[in-house]
């Protein structure tokens, strides 16, 4: 399996890159697409400083987990102060995982989900441990759906991918 994690300032640039890859490369033509997820960066509701790692210009990490999710029906009509407190608790639960970088993107009306998340870290264990810890926050009660999960190691040399293909 291969996951491609692309980002650009303009969505049309992503569409062009995807279409060019699928149409003009042998590798792209050979792949069977399983899933495509799309998100846009929008300012966070309560923390305008919460920016995706890729927007902050951070170097990509060695491991990534990407997944979509949708909040519960009552999340958006909940008292804003209560929602803010839940998000503060959620963020504080991640305090020991500063090396795990979050990329949170809005996906409303772009597919079947409301949000797209991508966590990057130096090791896969760090992502897994963080995701486990986040299960103990009250905000977790307000997640309706969060499947599928895709995880993988960053590969910078296409030869490495070709070497392991069946």
Model-predicted segments: where are they?
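Short S/T/G/P-rich N-terminal loop/turn motif that feeds into the first structured element of a domain
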Residues: 9-14, 32-96, 108-112, 122-132, ...
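Extended cationic-aromatic binding surfaces that line active-site or macromolecule-binding grooves
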Residues: 1-24
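Catalytic micro-motifs at enzyme active sites that drive phosphoryl/nucleotidyl and oxygen chemistry
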Residues: 22-24, 52-55, 103-105
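Short, well-ordered alpha-helical segments in soluble proteins
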Residues: 25, 90, 94-98, 138
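A common structural junction motif
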Residues: 22-30, 134-143
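A cross-kingdom feature marking solvent-exposed beta-strand/loop segments within repeated
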Residues: 1-3, 98-103, 113, 135-138, ...
